[in-house]
């Protein structure tokens, strides 16, 4: 009966709605049931309340024609467009920020090669416009406007419309041609010219009379002299001959001299070069849509504010930096310690050392209290704002560091320059590896600092409360203080807002701290009483059993015989 009575009292005390103990105030921080894992300098898996993904992995399945001007080469690459190949007439006068070359582009005229193809391609792409200026060239005693069956325009034999194929005259003459053009303008001129390589000696003399022919093009600072390479080659569009195209830039005040005795594919004018233009070229099969984006890749456009992307290493204009990582998360909240399902026996509240608080939704840091008036929770906005300001500043600085305009184009080399191509790819791979490592390190460093900052703000808040309460309360070691004086909700609020005056309550707190109180059912006393109750119950049970045996023996109901 005694043990049952004691257990009943314990249960009744635990289920009571009225709190009769000393007031308690606890400090805590926000928590969520499922946080986000981030990497720091010291740990690969740290759970935080919130984090921001820094790597963009989504792209649009199209190229955006705004705000950048895109020109679709369609079946023409940029060099064929500059030469004026049939099927490229839509590029006449075209202007672009990004010239889109298609993998399906084909040559549609006389078979040709460009010995320095990539340089010419780059010059044309960077220029951003096909601004062709026609000029008058006085060629003497030669036939002009040669045509070829390999170069059909509207099913009629034609030729590159920016070039003039010179052949011998009807009088079987091809005298020495020597022509000079002076650049009196204020811009650089790009001249594209060519040399025809016949397939046989007969073709050479039939076209130019002179065998061998020769073409020499000179400026004040350069000279290129080419002797035709006569010989049979594989047939392409019905032709075994070839044309080699060259290019010469003539600066303002310079001049260009054409000297030939045959085989010259002469220019009809020049392209105006714009040194201020920063256009480029992109080789991709992705269609042009109607979206808006400043970043283009060979896989589509990217629309994002994130500083990194792992979509493509080939990117144009205002693009995030390419990194190998699929994810880099920047902590934007504090360390997450999910709240336990139960907080000790009989609903005891706990502070930040044990866990976070999932109910603290209007701030990062806050208070919980328990007194005679009940329990309550309130956020501390000052410490919350201090942490947010520091984290926001870190986020802005990180984006500023990494959000430089990044432009990485695909570089190609002729097969003869294979070693250079391998070296270039090695350098690019090394740069990407280095930047990927730097990005990961930078994010880990910022995450470490973020967690340290938020932990520091929690400790600052705890120290502020401890200095206010001083000897009026006892630190319970779990982020809570037990207050040794009566503290109603107004008193609790003064602790929260920093206006608490410990001198007002000092005498009461000291008296209560040393006063001999009645038995207090703390966790330790409850255990002792339970053990005492259990022992007494066992003793009473044994005593009752012995008394029954003695009574039965006296009445003869039980006989006890002892044999020796």
UniProtKB/Swiss-Prot annotation:
A lipid is attached at residues 553, 560, 563 (S-palmitoyl cysteine). The keyword Oxidoreductase does not apply. It is a single-pass type I membrane protein. It comes from the Viruses. Pfam families: Hemagglutinin. Residues 17-527 are extracellular. Residues 1-16 form the signal peptide. The chain crosses the membrane at residues 528-548. Its main location: virion. GO terms for molecular function: host cell surface receptor binding. Keywords: Clathrin- and caveolin-independent endocytosis of virus by host, Clathrin-mediated endocytosis of virus by host, Disulfide bond, Fusion of virus membrane with host endosomal membrane, Fusion of virus membrane with host membrane, Glycoprotein, Hemagglutinin, Host cell membrane, Host membrane, Host-virus interaction, Lipoprotein, Membrane, Palmitate, Signal, Transmembrane, Transmembrane helix, Viral attachment to host cell, Viral envelope protein, Viral penetration into host cytoplasm, Virion, Virus endocytosis by host, Virus entry into host cell. GO terms for cellular component: host cell plasma membrane; membrane; viral envelope; virion membrane. It is found in: Virion membrane; Host apical cell membrane. Residues 549-564 are cytoplasmic. GO terms for biological process: clathrin-dependent endocytosis of virus by host cell; fusion of virus membrane with host endosome membrane; fusion of virus membrane with host plasma membrane; viral budding from plasma membrane; virion attachment to host cell. The record marks 343-344 as: Cleavage. Glycans are attached at residues 18, 34, 178, 310, 497. Palmitoylated. Disulfide bonds join 26-480, 64-291, 76-88, 109-151, 295-319, 487-491. Homotrimer of disulfide-linked HA1-HA2. Major glycoprotein, comprises over 80% of the envelope proteins present in virus particle. Belongs to the influenza viruses hemagglutinin family. Binds to sialic acid-containing receptors on the cell surface, bringing about the attachment of the virus particle to the cell. This attachment induces virion internalization of about two third of the virus particles through clathrin-dependent endocytosis and about one third through a clathrin- and caveolin-independent pathway. Plays a major role in the determination of host range restriction and virulence. Class I viral fusion protein. Binds to sialic acid-containing receptors on the cell surface, bringing about the attachment of the virus particle to the cell. This attachment induces virion internalization either through clathrin-dependent endocytosis or through clathrin- and caveolin-independent pathway. Plays a major role in the determination of host range restriction and virulence. Class I viral fusion protein. Responsible for penetration of the virus into the cell cytoplasm by mediating the fusion of the membrane of the endocytosed virus particle with the endosomal membrane. This is Hemagglutinin. It comes from Influenza A virus (strain A/Duck/Alberta/28/1976 H4N6). The gene is HA.
